From Swiss-Prot:
InterPro entries noted in UniProt: Smg
Organism of origin: Neisseria meningitidis serogroup B (strain ATCC BAA-335 / MC58)
The organism's taxonomic lineage, starting at the top: Bacteria, Pseudomonadati, Pseudomonadota, Betaproteobacteria, Neisseriales
A Pfam family matched in the record: DUF494
PANTHER family (alphabetical): PROTEIN SMG (PTHR38692:SF1)
Family membership: Belongs to the Smg family.
Protein name as catalogued: Protein Smg homolog
Length: 153
């Protein structure tokens, strides 16, 4: 799914410029992506479209997020640290963080990594046309690189 999201971010200016899901699915298939990866990405995009009514305002970085047992069992400590960092840097709101965590909890446990969390964060911010501080954006974009080579065509 990470590579599909990276492809979308590289090839479309924003969420609104993407073709309808059926056409996008065919386009991604023609680009050589796996059908299951395409389906998972389209599902995530649908969730984002349906959650567009939240506030994109940065949260008070002093707020404390308590993770449930299920979340602590599934989310690596590094991912929880990334979520706190993004809140502290005012890169995401509390609502956006919750959407990211919700999305991560629907991914198989062995696929939940810091890079996956970064890419899902980028997808969410891209969908909301959010501006990012340069250093935070660079940190998130690093997840789209594999061995210093772009994962996108």
């Amino acid at each position: 799914m990470t590579e599909v999201i990276a492809y979308l971010i590289e090839h479309f200016q924003d969420f609104d410029t993407c073709p309808p899901p059926e056409d996008l699915g065919m386009l991604l298939e023609e680009a050589g992506f796996d059908t299951m990866e395409i389906g998972n990405t389209l599902m995530m995009m649908e969730v984002l479209l349906n959650s567009s009514e939240f506030s994109a305002e940065p949260a008070d970085s002093g707020a404390l997020r308590v993770y449930s047992k299920e979340e602590t069992d599934n989310l690596p400590q590094e991912v929880m640290g990334l979520m706190q960092y993004l809140i502290e840097e005012k890169a995401v709101s509390c609502e956006q963080r919750e959407i990211i965590i919700h999305a991560l909890m629907h991914i198989p446990g062995d696929e939940i990594t810091v890079d996956t969390a970064k890419v899902l964060t980028l997808l969410l911010l891209w969908a909301n046309k959010s501006e990012l501080p340069v250093l935070v954006g660079d940190e998130l974009m690093s997840a789209l690189l594999l061995d210093n080579k772009p994962t996108m065509n």
